[in-house]
Each structure stands twice: as structure tokens, then as C-alpha cells.
């Protein structure tokens, strides 16, 4: 998978480690397949999520980042072939959806200028469709609709954006969204029982874990098969590279 990690995360080449971590968290949550309801878009989200995971893997490691800056190659050296991508990606996928990460990001993101900008971008993208806005903006729920409408109405009043007909309140659509959200919550609960996670989730809640933290266990399990597909592709690509004759230290010193 040939990508530009800086472009994928949306950061400049001189971005600090902290900025890269923040960009990674935002992109990972934004493209997480389990926050997408449309099945076709879910496939696209998985592809983007994989790119984000790889980009962060390069830029979060000083040696890989330095090597990429010099050569434009994602793989560091021949020795990097032995890197345990499976273990690293497993930890990465789990870290993205941990309750702590979600709560931390949500606390800093909601009501921020960054969220307001994302709301307005989603408004423009959907031509005023609240369905699109709630689908695009991270960490939001049905209950955020009135708050988002206030943000958008203020921007319209200030002349920053134009008003679309689709933005007009529609009680019928609001009820439909509420029913859809209730149905998805029920499906998630049924899936947790099917996967044998329901008892684990109950124990987490009894132990004082938040709903988001408990649900993260379910999300991680659903991501397992996706993760291993990515790992297989990476290992296949790297194993082909490893068949090439390795240069001796002497020959490398001449280059």
C-alpha cells in the first residue's frame, strides 16, 4: 500500500509528535468502520482506516519517519522485515477504540472550534441534510441535533454560509433518525450476545466502566478479521521484498 503518511494524517512534514498523535486519533475515529452505517461506505472507511494505521506506524517511529523523509519509502530497512506488524497493529486497533481514548478525545472535541468547523463542513457537504451532518461529525449522537442547528444558524446569520432548503426542521425525519439509532443500539446488543461478549460487558459496567469503554470490547472483536486481512497483505508484500539479495555492509558504505 503506497501512501504519503503526512497527507493521510493531514499534517505538515515538520509536525510535532503530539500533533501527529492528535491527527491520528481524529482520523482513526473519523474513519472507524463501526461508526459508519451504510455498508458500502463501511468498506471505504475500512480502507481509509488501514491507511491511517499505516501512516501513524511510520510517523510515530523516529527511525521510520526519518527514513521516509529521506527516501520516500515506508519500510525502514531490510531488518524491518522482521518487525512484528501483527502485534503492533493489534495494539493499535485496540488503542483506537479504548474507552479512555474515546472519552479523552470526546471531551476535548465536543463544543470546540474544531467541532464547529466539522459541523459546517458536513452541512456544506450534505447541502443542509441533517442525516449527513450526524453521519460525518465525530462523537455525535441524535441528541446533538439541536446543538448543531444552533451552530449552523449562527453561521448563516453571520453570513459565513448559505441556507439550504434541506436544513429546514423535519419532525418526520427526526423521528426516523431516533428509531434508527434505537434499532442500531439493539443490533449492537444482540451482536454482543452472539459473540459471547454480553457477560463481559455487564462485568465491565458493574466494575464502573462507561458504556463507551464497555462497548469498545465489542468493537475490537469486530475489527479482528479486518486487522488480520491487512496484516496478511503487509506480510505478503514484505516477504516478497525479503527475497531480494541483501546488500553487505561493505557495499552499503559505498553508496
Swiss-Prot record:
Residues 167-215, 230-255 are annotated as: Disordered. It comes from the Eukaryota. Keywords: Chaperone, Nucleus. InterPro entries: DnaJ_domain, HTH_DNAJC9, J_dom_sf, J_domain-containing_protein. Residues 167-178, 243-255 have a biased composition (Basic residues). Residues 4-72 form the J domain. Pfam families: DnaJ, HTH_DNAJC9. This is Uncharacterized J domain-containing protein SPAC1071.09c. The lineage of its organism: Eukaryota, Fungi, Dikarya, Ascomycota, Taphrinomycotina.
Amino acid at each position: 500500500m503506497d501512501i504519503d503518511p503526512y497527507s493521510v494524517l493531514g499534517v505538515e512534514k515538520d509536525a510535532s509528535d503530539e500533533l501527529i498523535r492528535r491527527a491520528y486519533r481524529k482520523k482513526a475515529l473519523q474513519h472507524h468502520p463501526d461508526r459508519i452505517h451504510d455498508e458500502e461506505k463501511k468498506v471505504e472507511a475500512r480502507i481509509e482506516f488501514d491507511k491511517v494505521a499505516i501512516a501513524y506506524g511510520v510517523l510515530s517511529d523516529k527511525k521510520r519517519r526519518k527514513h521516509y523523509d529521506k527516501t520516500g519509502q515506508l519500510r525502514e530497512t531490510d531488518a524491518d522485515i522482521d518487525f512484528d506488524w501483527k502485534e503492533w497493529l493489534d495494539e493499535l486497533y485496540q488503542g483506537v477504540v479504548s474507552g479512555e481514548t474515546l472519552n479523552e478525545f470526546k471531551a476535548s472535541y465536543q463544543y470546540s472550534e474544531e467541532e464547529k468547523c466539522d459541523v459546517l463542513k458536513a452541512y456544506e457537504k450534505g447541502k443542509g441534510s441533517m442525516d449527513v451532518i450526524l453521519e460525518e461529525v465525530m462523537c455525535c449522537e441524535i441528541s446533538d441535533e439541536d446543538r448543531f442547528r444552533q451552530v449552523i444558524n449562527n453561521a448563516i446569520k453571520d453570513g459565513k454560509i448559505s441556507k439550504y432548503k434541506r436544513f429546514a426542521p423535519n419532525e418526520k425525519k427526526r423521528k426516523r433518525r431516533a428509531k434508527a439509532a434505537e434499532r442500531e443500539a439493539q443490533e449492537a446488543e444482540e451482536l454482543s450476545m452472539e459473540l459471547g461478549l454480553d457477560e463481559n460487558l455487564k462485568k465491565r459496567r458493574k466494575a464502573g466502566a462507561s458504556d463507551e469503554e464497555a462497548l469498545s470490547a465489542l468493537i475490537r472483536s469486530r475489527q479482528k478479521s479486518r486487522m488480520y486481512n491487512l496484516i496478511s497483505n503487509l506480510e505478503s508484500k514484505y516477504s516478497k521484498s525479503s527475497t531480494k539479495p541483501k546488500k553487505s555492509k561493505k557495499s552499503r558504505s559505498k553508496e
